[in-house]
Amino acid sequence: MIVETTNTLVAAAASLFSVTFSPEVRTAYVSRGKVIDDRPIQVNSLRADMKLGAEAQFGRIGAWHWGYNALTPRVNCAEDQFAAEFDWGAYYHYDLELADGWSLGNEIMPDWIIMPSADPVFEWRVSQSLKNPYVVPFWLMRRDQPSSRNCYFNVGLMKPISFRTASADWLKPLVITPMAMVEFGNSSLMTARYGRQESGGAVPTGLQAIDFELRADYAVTENFGVYVSILQFDLLNPKARRQSHKPNCRDITVFAVGVKLSF
C-alpha cells in the first residue's frame, strides 16, 4: 500500500514537469528586424516548465535557453568572425480560457543575452496569442533594461493546419503553419541596429521589416518530432535599407531544419 501510494505521488509530481529541446540548423540568422548573420548557424533551444496546479489552472513557470553558433567564417552581415549568442530566461505563462477552443496565452519573461564580443544585455519580453480554431493573432514586445532603452515590437498572424482527420495514417502527425509578421522598433533600437543616418541623425521610430514563414512539423512519436521551415525576411524601412549596404543584409530567405524532443 505504501509503495503504491509513493508511486502515485511520484507519477503525479512528474506529470507537472515537462522539458522540450530543439536543436536545428539555419542558413542565416534574423533577429529584431535585422539580418544578424548571413551564414549557416546551429541553434539550440531548451524550455523546461512546471504546471501550477494539476491542470495548469494557475499557469506555468519555467526556464528557457536559446543559443547559436556560426558554422563558417564571416560572410557579409556578421560583425564577428565566429559569432555566438546565449540567451537565458525565466518565465510565467498563463492561458486564459475564453470559450470552447478559444484561449488567450499570456507570457512574461526576464531574459539575459550574452555574447562573447559585447556586454551582457538584460531585457523584458511580454507576449500574447489568441488561440482559436481559425487564425491565431500574436504580438511580442522586447525592452532592453536599464540603460539602452531599446524597444522592439512585432505583431502577426499564423494558421496551424492539422491533418489529424486525414484518411492516410502517415499524414495525421503533420502540422503545417503559415505565418506573416511585421516588425517595429523605437529610434534607439533602429539606430543601434543600422547606425546613424548620413546626416548624423538617429533613425526614427517606425516600421522595420516584414516576415513570411512556412513551417512543417511532423510528430514521429509522442516524444520526438522533426520540422523544416522557410522564412522570407524583407527590410522595409528606407533609412535602414540605405544603411545596410549589402543586398543579403536587407532581404534574405532563411531555411531551417531541426528536431524536437519532448519529455
Residue map of PLM features:
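Short secondary-structure boundary segments
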Residues: 105-130, 156, 163-169
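Surface-exposed loop and membrane-interface regions of Gram-negative outer-membrane beta-barrel proteins
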Residues: 56-118, 236-240
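Short loop/turn motifs that connect adjacent beta-strands in outer-membrane beta-barrel proteins
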Residues: 9-18, 51-62, 80, 95-105, ...
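Short glycine/proline- and aromatic-enriched beta-strand/turn motifs that initiate or cap beta-hairpins
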Residues: 2-3, 9, 13-73, 90, ...
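Membrane-embedded beta-strand positions of outer-membrane beta-barrel proteins
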Residues: 21-23, 61-65, 90, 106-110, ...
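Transmembrane beta-strands of outer-membrane beta-barrel pores
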Residues: 25-31, 58, 65-71, 94, ...
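Residues that define the transmembrane beta-barrel architecture of outer-membrane proteins
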Residues: 17, 38-48, 82-88, 104, ...
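Outer-membrane beta-barrel transmembrane domain signature
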Residues: 45, 53-57, 142-251, 258-263
